[in-house]
Amino acid sequence: MNADSRTRLNQRPEWTALAKHREELAGTHLRDLFAADPGRGAGYTLEVGDLHVDYSKHLVTDETLRLLRELAAATDVFGLRDAMFRGEKINVTEDRAVLHTALRAPRDAVVEVDGENVVPAVHAVLDKMSTFAERVRTGEWTGHTGKPIKNIVNVGIGGSDLGPAMAYEVLRSFTDRSLTVRFVSNVDGADLHEAVRDLDPAETLFVIASKTFTTIETITNATSARDWLLTELKAGQEAVAKHFVALSTNAEKVSEFGIDTANMFEFWDWVGGRYSFDSAIGLSLMIAIGPERFREMLDGFRIVDEHFESAPAEDNVPLLLGLLGIWYGNFHDAQSHAVLPYSHYLSKFTAYLQQLDMESNGKSVQRDGNPVEWETGPVVWGTPGTNGQHAYYQLIHQGTKLIPADFIGFAEPVADLLPGLVAQHDLLMANFFAQTQALAFGKTPDEVRAEGVPEQLVPHKTFKGNHPTTTILAKELTPSVLGQLIALYEHKVFVQGAVWNIDSFDQWGVELGKVLAKRVEPALTEGADVPGLDESTKALVAKYRQLRGR
């Protein structure tokens, strides 16, 4: 997009048409929309894979959706989508292709980067992962003392941690329960301390996830883990090769650490960290759930990839969800988006989406380097129902902010629940459906009065409703369904970035903090005079050193 005012997003006729339409809909209530269209509840739904997506409780009409699709066409969302799938370098600031979709491509697919088909390499790594995972799961792989591995500790940060940690929790009912799997990411030593304190080092395998093998937090934790292992085993460096594997591309650094490069699993610079857990980064997950179920998850990703690539605009679910976010963020001044899964197993799902969405679209500069003049990525937040109902739903129901929300639920409880707990699933889902109805339709003053409520309390017990929600419903939670859900949100984020004309695949804000931390550390440890520290930070460093007795 050019900097010329005629082509700026907020100057486009499609944008101004939406702004005018927003004014025309002001005062329209979801109660009115449903009254005008009795078939709305069934008509405003889409299907993709195993996911049933109900968007009837959104503040939209057929005209709204048409105008949003016109905006997508004007900003060439599908053109950028096609360029991504072709392997073009759409990450403009790093001159990289964006091909997380290749990680789940079938063996016979052809996806080229710089003229080379990357799919054979993807499947070679998957096959290598599968072989290793089975060796661990069957007990064939043993530690330094000959004991089989019973504990897996994944050491990474960001995309090397959030994805596999989330997926392990989501698919816990599919895991080998004889294995203990833990995740360490924080450079705070307490994280590693708590992860290993009750583990037998002779039965523990560390999976070190760092593409460059230089990520400071990860290598610091990996070094401490190595020290713990060798001290506890009273062993020499030769023990490392039986208890550590690497997810990396830096063979030299991996070898220097003591890891056998035969146990190094590679990935590529055309995979961003927050899109990487279906690559080698998912090794700890594959060990936990097994290669077959890991591939089922990849199949789920692919279902939505193919849908996003081929479905027409009016039936394209990621496009719809992305455009609904544009509608609220840019035309209703919504600052955040809640994702509320009604499944305990999805307890880390929203935290994963925080990185996916906020690191991708937390940008204020266009792809051409010009500043944006419109709102971009929202704050993404939420926790599983029904816990959130007793915490922050009050603000969604009766607060002053418009907060669009996604409700994710499943018709069947997981298969291995104790029989006495299965009946609770209906209560969980009763809350699921009740909340979206309450948010949409609220409770009028007359309805409150009809219950005999004293007049002075009527305003307090009135709910205006008109809070938009998407309901995503699947029969059951499976590896495939998890893949479908993640791909759905990946492509939703892509759509929004394309409309906003930002690079959704870099993360320069992350890099700045890393650089500054390296400069500040000597001031903490040695009292060094660090050039460029502001007066506030200098005073805080001095206070820190005083409290540490330095």
From Swiss-Prot:
Substrates-to-products reaction catalysed: alpha-D-glucose 6-phosphate = beta-D-fructose 6-phosphate
Assigned keywords, A-Z: Cytoplasm, Gluconeogenesis, Glycolysis, Isomerase
Location of this chain's protein in the cell: Cytoplasm
Gene Ontology molecular-function annotations: carbohydrate derivative binding; glucose-6-phosphate isomerase activity; monosaccharide binding
The organism's place on the tree of life at top rank: Bacteria
PROSITE patterns, per database record: P_GLUCOSE_ISOMERASE_1, P_GLUCOSE_ISOMERASE_2, P_GLUCOSE_ISOMERASE_3
Pathway in which this enzyme or protein is active: Carbohydrate biosynthesis; gluconeogenesis; Carbohydrate degradation; glycolysis; D-glyceraldehyde 3-phosphate and glycerone phosphate from D-glucose: step 2/4
Entry EC no(s): 5.3.1.9
Pfam families on file: PGI (PF00342)
GO biological processes: gluconeogenesis; glucose 6-phosphate metabolic process; glycolytic process
Keyword Isomerase applies: yes
This protein's GO CC annotations: cytosol
Active site (UniProt): 359 (proton donor), 390, 514
Main localization, broad class: cytoplasm
Task performed by this protein: Catalyzes the reversible isomerization of glucose-6-phosphate to fructose-6-phosphate.
Family in the record: Belongs to the GPI family.
Name listed for the protein in its UniProt record: Glucose-6-phosphate isomerase 2
Gene of this entry: pgi2
